Regions:
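Active-site loop segments of alpha/beta catalytic cores
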Residues: 1-159
Length: 159
C-alpha cells in the first residue's frame, strides 16, 4: 500500500488486550518489535494500535519503534501518554458507541478528547476502535468538520 501512495502504515492488533501483560511481553511484543524494526526505513508514519482493553500493556510499548500508539477509549489521552513515558505520539480515543448519540453529545466528547490531546505535541484524533456498521456517515462527516474547526480554534487560542 505504501508503494501505491499510502501516507501511513498502521498495524491493528485489535484483541491483544485480552492477554495478560506477561503473555503479551513473552509472545507478542518480540514480534511487534521486529515488525516495526523491519519497517524503520519506510518514509511514512508508523502506527501501532494495540486494540481494546490494552491500557495495561502501554508501558511495554515504550521501546517499539512506532511513531504513534493508538489508544482505546478506556484510557485517557493524559494517562496513555503517562504510561508511554511521553516517548511517542498518541492517537485516539473516542468511544465508537458515542457515534450513536445526538450530534451535540458527540461534539462534547470529541472536544474533551481534543482538549487533552493538544496539551502536548504529538496527538492525532481518532476513534478508540473501529466503526460499527450502523454508524451514520452524516454524523461522521459532521464530526470530521467539528474536529477540524474546534482543533484550529483551540490551537489559535494557544498562540
Amino acid at each position: 500500500h505504501i508503494a501505491a501512495g499510502g501516507k501511513a502504515f498502521q498495524l491493528f492488533d485489535s484483541w491483544v488486550g485480552a492477554l495478560s501483560p506477561n503473555d503479551f511481553r513473552v509472545f507478542v511484543l518480540p514480534v511487534i518489535e521486529r515488525i516495526f524494526h523491519e519497517l524503520s526505513d519506510l518514509q511514512v508514519p508508523k502506527i501501532y494500535f494495540p486494540g481494546v482493553a490494552s491500557g495495561e500493556l502501554l508501558p511495554e510499548l515504550t521501546n517499539v519503534k512506532a511513531d504513534v500508539i493508538g489508544l482505546d477509549w478506556r484510557v485517557s489521552i493524559a494517562e496513555g501518554r503517562r504510561r508511554l513515558n511521553n516517548k511517542v505520539a498518541v492517537q485516539g480515543n473516542l468511544d465508537p458507541t458515542i457515534l450513536q448519540a445526538p450530534q451535540h453529545i458527540i461534539e462534547q466528547h470529541a472536544a474533551a478528547i481534543i482538549d487533552q490531546g493538544i496539551e502536548q505535541p504529538g496527538y492525532i484524533f481518532n476513534l478508540g476502535h473501529g466503526l460499527y456498521p450502523e454508524a451514520s456517515l452524516d454524523k461522521l462527516k459532521s464530526l470530521t468538520e467539528f474536529i477540524h474547526t474546534y482543533s484550529e480554534k483551540k490551537l489559535l487560542q494557544r498562540t
